[in-house]
Design a protein with these regions (language model features):
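Conserved mid-core segment of classical short-chain dehydrogenase/reductases
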Residues: 86-103, 145
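C-terminal helical subdomain
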Residues: 174, 198-250
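Active-site loop-to-helix junction immediately N-terminal to the catalytic Tyr of the SDR YXXXK motif
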Residues: 97, 142-150, 162
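Active-site helix of classical SDR
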Residues: 117, 152
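Residue(s) in the substrate-gating loop at a strand-loop-helix junction
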Residues: 136
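Conserved glycine-rich cofactor-binding loop
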Residues: 10, 17-18
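Conserved glycine-rich Rossmann-like NAD(P)H-binding loop of the short-chain dehydrogenase/reductase
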Residues: 33-47
Length: 250
C-alpha cells in the first residue's frame, strides 16, 4: 500500500485513544489521511498525537453525544468515518447484573453508532465516503458474561445494514460496512474477557487464548480497515475480522 494512498482524505475515528481505535488511526495516518481522533481521554489522545504528529487532530469529546456527532460531521465532512467507541461491560453472569449494567452497551455503543450513522445520512457525506462500524464476533456467538453486549453488537451490525439500504435507496453513494472482530487479549476489553472466560472454563488464560486461534491485534484491525477504504470498496455489509484477516458474512 502506498504511504500516500489516502492523501487529501479526512478520516474520523471514534474511540481513537487506545486499542483498535488507536491502531486504526495509526494505519489511516500512515496511508496519508488526515485523521481526526475522538475520545474522552485527553491524555490518551495526546499520546496518539505525539506518535502521529500533525496528521492527527485530537478532539476530546463524548462520542455518544448526538450534538457532538452532528457538530463534528459538519465540521470535518470525513471521507472515512470509523465508529469504534464503546464501553467495557462488566464481566459477570446475567443474574449478577442490574438492568443498568446489562444495558450499558445499548446506551453507549448502540446510541453512538445510531447518532453518527444518522448524521452521515442526513448530512449527507460525499458520494464514495465509507462508514465503518465496529460490531463484535459476540454478535454471532453470544457472550454470557457480558450482559447485553452481544445483543448491542448485533444491533450495530443491523443498523449498519439499514444505513446501507437507505444510502442505496436515496442514491447517496455512501458505503456502510460493519466489522465483527474476534475476542483478543490485545485490547483492554479483550484482556478482561479472556481472563473471565478462562476462569469460567476452569483453565489458565494462556490455554484459553491459544484456543482462540491466530490473535488479532490493533495494528491488524487498522490494516484491514485501510485496505477496505483504499480498495474498490466493500462488497458486503459485514465481515468477520480475525488475525487471519477479513471474511465476508452473509
Amino acid at each position: 500500500m502506498s504511504d500516500n494512498e489516502l492523501a487529501g482524505a479526512t478520516a474520523l475515528v471514534t474511540g481513537a485513544g487506545r486499542g483498535f481505535g488507536r491502531g486504526i488511526a495509526t494505519a489511516l495516518s500512515s496511508a496519508g489521511a488526515q485523521v481526526v481522533g475522538v475520545a474522552r481521554d485527553r491524555a490518551a489522545l495526546e499520546e496518539v498525537r505525539a506518535a502521529l504528529g500533525e496528521s492527527f487532530t485530537p478532539v476530546t469529546a463524548d462520542a455518544t453525544d448526538p450534538i457532538v456527532a452532528g457538530q463534528l460531521t459538519d465540521a470535518y465532512r470525513p471521507a472515512i468515518l470509523v465508529l469504534n467507541a464503546g464501553a467495557t461491560p462488566l464481566p459477570r453472569p446475567i443474574q449478577h447484573h442490574t438492568w443498568q449494567t446489562f444495558s450499558r452497551n445499548w446506551d453507549s455503543d448502540v446510541q453512538h453508532v445510531f447518532n453518527w450513522v444518522r448524521e452521515a445520512l442526513l448530512a449527507p457525506l460525499a458520494p464514495g465516503s465509507t462508514v465503518v462500524t465496529l460490531s463484535s464476533a459476540a454478535a454471532l456467538r453470544g457472550s454470557p458474561l457480558s450482559g447485553g453486549y452481544a445483543g448491542a453488537k448485533a444491533a450495530i451490525r443491523w443498523l449498519t445494514a439499514y444505513a446501507a439500504e437507505e444510502s442505496a435507496r436515496d442514491k447517496l453513494g455512501i458505503n456502510f460496512v460493519s466489522l465483527l472482530p474476534q475476542l483478543t487479549p490485545a485490547t483492554a476489553l479483550g484482556a478482561v474477557y479472556t481472563a473471565a472466560y478462562a476462569a469460567r472454563q476452569g483453565t489458565d488464560e494462556a490455554s484459553y487464548i491459544g484456543g482462540l486461534g491466530l490473535g488479532l491485534t490493533p495494528e491488524q484491525a487498522g490494516q484491514a480497515i485501510t485496505g477496505l477504504v483504499t480498495g474498490p470498496g466493500p462488497d458486503h455489509d459485514a465481515y468477520l475480522l480475525t488475525g487471519a484477516g477479513l471474511r465476508p458474512l452473509t
